[in-house]
Amino acid sequence: MNAFSGGARRTLVGAAVSCSLCGTALAQQATPHPFDQITVSADRITPTAPGEDAARAEAARVPGGTDVVSASDYAHGRASTFSDVFAFSPGVFAQPRFGAEEARLSIRGSGLQRTFHMRGIYLMQDGVPITLADGSGDFQTVEPLALSYTEVRRGANALEYGGTTLGGSINFVSPSGHDGGGIRPRVEGGSFGYRRALVTVGDASKNSDYFASLSAYEQDGFRDWSHQENERLFANAGFRLSETVESRFFVSALSSYSQLPGSITKAQLKADPEQANATSLAGRQKRNYDLYRLANRTVIELGNDSRLELTAGYSYKDLFHPIFQVLQQRSNDYNLGVRYVAEHSLGGFANRVVLGASPSWNDVSDDRFVNVAGQKGAPTAASEQRSSNLTAYAEDQLAVTSRWTLVAGVQWTDSKRRYDDHFLSNGDQSLDATYARIAPKLGFLWQVTRDWTVYGNVSDSFEPPSFGELTGGPGIDLLDAQHARTVELGTRGTVARVQWDFAAYSARVHDELLGLNGPGGEPLGTVNAPHTRHDGFEAGAQVAITKSLSWRSSYLWSRFRFDDNASYGDNALPGIPAHFYRGELTWAPARGTASVYFITLNTEWSPRRYAVDMAHTLFADPYTLFGLKVGRNAGAGFSWFLEGRNLANRTYTATTGVIADARGQDAAQFLPGDGRAVYAGVSWKPK
């Protein structure tokens, strides 16, 4: 029997669903391009692989910044980097490091010092963590073209999935066999030796379905010593075991090879942005690894509008990584999850409760050697690194009126980091640390109209250091966990032809983890900054100007700074521009009920210089880029696109490193963006 009364259930669910569907409708109207090879069936009902409409309805319940990025939003152009995926996702700063899959990914200033890999964001794939147990992550574990959509929960809005970090969570969701059967190939190619091929296959029957993708990617790169290649297999199969139980298994296998050209000085960037860092080139620096992953997600419908979600995952990674030393690592990562969701009446009010726990742990064998032209020399370190985390969380939403919903939540996290030093010639540097904290959350949702919501929350975040911080310098850094309290106020909705998502936030951060490099790029370790402030404004908008003409944009204002620091006063934290804008104008004339072709003009604008060092003596320059995309649905299931990027061939800094004090001198901290480039792609799907 349904525990909701009809009125109570409509109070809590109806507004969220109607608002999310309205947003979906405008998103489709405002991006009318025909290149939709990764079409998702919004009508499918499979608990272990919910559709995009269900994800939007869930996001509409959240009293904070969220987004759902459909794969069709970026499939009409080159789809290679996280910058391609999140180009128009409000609040997400994603910049390629050297035109390849490595990126600088940050939300609300998360992981500011990390110009490599990722920290400060809880990454999941199909609801199962792919972030490693110590909090670090890789970008090559995701194939953008093998996704149906991506969920973004900014900041503490990731609480109901176990995310505790300042940046929040990102969940990459794979298609299931219900998203369309048959074989679907796609190929892309273009400048700098870029080549990518993908084929997917899927099918569904009454009680089972499967989906698989196989991709291969290679590029020579804009810069010297920036060749990349990888091969990736992703597959999942779902089984309806009974009327109330569904289980889905996921398999991933990938091999990644990346040359690392490193950072160069500002003068070198202006003279020849294609050159590699001399030290990187001499050390033949690269990052190669193989990864294998197994996961399961099982959903049990308990009746009375309640369900139990169970997840489990295991991954193995073998890494060979010549940088300032040669790192050779073999890691085993494990995670489990249990999540209970119930919707019922509480004192006559509609109520939704989420309870969950997510333990994770890993074991890393880490051996280090002198780098002799990219090969192993004499050993310099040997260790065993063990991480474990246990996060328990609870969140309750109570609809106190037809327009107002109050939200309260809490998390408890216990994390352990153990470093066993097996190379004792330079002394025993073993480490055993425990980090624990409770993080509360209070928020509200105000349904101003059917299509307009105002929200706000006050919430805490908690982030223990990863081994990248603890062992990333010349020795072991004894660090405290980073924690913060964030106040957020925002609005999302649709009026006529306009859809918007605006959020302002202010975070007081304590013991922020800031990594330092020397002027030559050598790692100097990580420190805790006692007090910092992260203030920002995140904006996304779409406008259907006419039936054929649409505009969409995203804007980030970021004011991250020290708070009365003894050395740096109130200086802005380096590494991310204060203002960052992307926009595109698309013309897609309709023929009948579908668009046959499209033309898109786009721009990327960083209008002000920003600091590279904490002392503010070295800066990255502003820039403006322009691009053009055209595409056509050629009939018989075929579509194609042609895209030009950086058409003015602007020399610019895509992102930078972070150093303490450049003392007014130039330093090798600049990562050039790609020059003028042209890409093309073609795909086919069965009718």
Description of each model-found segment:
Residues 401, 406, 414, 506-508, ...:
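Gram-negative outer-membrane beta-barrel transporters
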Residues 350, 357-447:
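Signature of Gram-negative outer-membrane beta-barrel scaffolds
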Residues 37-77, 103-106, 121:
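N-terminal periplasmic "start-of-domain" segments of outer-membrane beta-barrel proteins
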Residues 63-66, 83-128:
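Extracytoplasmic beta-strand/coil segments of soluble accessory domains associated
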Residues 182, 189-218, 223-261, 286-302, ...:
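Transmembrane beta-barrel wall of Gram-negative outer-membrane proteins
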Residues 605-612, 632-687:
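C-terminal beta-signal and adjacent terminal beta-strands/loops
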Residues 307-320, 447, 453-459, 481-544, ...:
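Membrane-embedded beta-barrel scaffold of Gram-negative outer-membrane proteins
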Residues 112, 121, 128-154:
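Short acidic/polar hinge/loop motifs at secondary-structure boundaries
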